């Protein structure tokens, strides 16, 4: 058994206050489902899509450990509006390793986006962001499905290190941990000494962050045995001022 640092869970009713007070909040899966207004098991309809991700061809460390898919949408007036498939871009100020270039990833499959849990989750998270920023009428959302595996011996969820994403809010949902150690989440105040370390271990648990106020990273993963392992996540970013790179 690998010892894990427990996540500092926030009750659902305290989500807005925690996000306002410290710049991040962690919800368990039951709270995420309640926030989205779906059954916990509805999220499981999304799981098969993590078995069909595509290799990340842009890794500058030469690794083969990351697979992913990408999609974008706009949320306005309580409606999710899909947008044509587009590139993912981050300035070098936010991603010194992979920033400053257009990266085109395989799109998230239409059947995944059509699952009822998908728009329910996106709208619920957009609502949480809007309660922090009631002036925002339109959120530009990027969704990233990730699988980090141990095919290279070590998999790096954040090869760029501790970082901000250059957006307004970042949501990280743990989808699965299989036969690994590591993958510890670390969240630090962007201005100040405060920080916390913990492990998201429950499928569909959530870390929601105010990107201007905290920086974050996840530590490398290693396999528990020779058969290898992986860590699956869903990352959604919310930005008021358009998509990065526009």
Where are these regions (language model features)?
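Short loop/turn segments at secondary-structure transitions that flank enzyme active sites
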Residues: 33, 149, 177, 215, ...
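N-terminal auxiliary "cap/dimerization" subdomain that precedes the catalytic jelly-roll/cupin core
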Residues: 1-92
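Catalytic core of Fe(II)/2-oxoglutarate
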Residues: 184-246
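Catalytic core of non-heme Fe(II) oxygenases with the double-stranded beta-helix
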Residues: 133-202
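Structured loops at beta-to-helix junctions and adjacent beta-edge loops in soluble globular domains
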Residues: 30, 75-78, 144-146, 174, ...
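Conserved hydrophobic/aromatic beta-strand scaffold that supports enzyme active sites
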Residues: 26, 145, 170-172, 206-208, ...
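Conserved aromatic-histidine-acidic binding/catalytic patches
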Residues: 34, 110, 159-162
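Signature of the catalytic double-stranded beta-helix
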Residues: 76-142
